[in-house]
Amino acid sequence: MEALKKIAGVTAAQYVTDGMTIGLGTGSTAYYFVEEIGRRVKQEGLQVVGVTTSSVTSKQAEGLGIPLKSIDDIDSIDLTVDGADEVDKDFNGIKGGGAALLMEKIVATPTKEYIWVVDASKMVEHLGAFKLPVEVVQYGADRLFRVFEKAGYKPSFRMKGDSRLVTDMQNYIIDLDLGCIKDPVAFGHLLDGTVGVVEHGLFNGMVDKVIVASKDGVTVLEAPKAS
């Protein structure tokens, strides 16, 4: 499995060329993309500027010598490569297993070409078997938890050891065990309109390419362009 993740990450790095501003994703597959960019910067003299999606990725990129800028200092990003926890046939996805969903979505938004790198196990018929992360402000989080519970979403607070995980943005994450999300777009809108929810892990209609690594090789899936 780790070998497949590496193949997907390295394949995505081939889309990066000199002079690009690139979004550097978070997670076990995006890790290999960042490593390959670091190698190319060092060995090939690749000239890029990175924008990171988490403190973990910032630390990795700095260690590799990749020049970085804040999201606040750029207007657009040429290419962002990130992982995904699930991807359905309509190119909707669940992200946030690494607790970086808010920063990931902020970086994805001004991106001209958004690529996900996954192994074949992440491709699903319907989203929802992977718990949907919902980032919430700390104030009122327990009340919101009860609202989700009453709605039948089977919520659980993301934990780190014995205490609630706190994201880079100082929020909590409530994971929803939904089983199957029949209409990801409608459910995304529902969460968008829920007071106290900062962001959720449904990335609907955002991705341009999905690079899928399997034992049979690498497949690049292109999302249909919006008319």
Swiss-Prot record:
Substrate binds at T26, G27, S28, T29, D82, G83, A84, D85, K95, G96, G97, G98, K122. Keywords: Isomerase. CDD domains: RPI_A (cd01398). Its EC number is 5.3.1.6. The active site is at E104. It is an enzyme of class 5 (isomerase). Belongs to the ribose 5-phosphate isomerase family. This is Ribose-5-phosphate isomerase A. Homodimer. Pfam families: Rib_5-P_isom_A (PF06026). It catalyses: aldehydo-D-ribose 5-phosphate = D-ribulose 5-phosphate. It comes from the Bacteria. InterPro entries: NagB/RpiA_transferase-like, Ribose-5P_isomerase, Ribose5P_isomerase_typA_subgr, Ribose5P_isomerase_type_A.
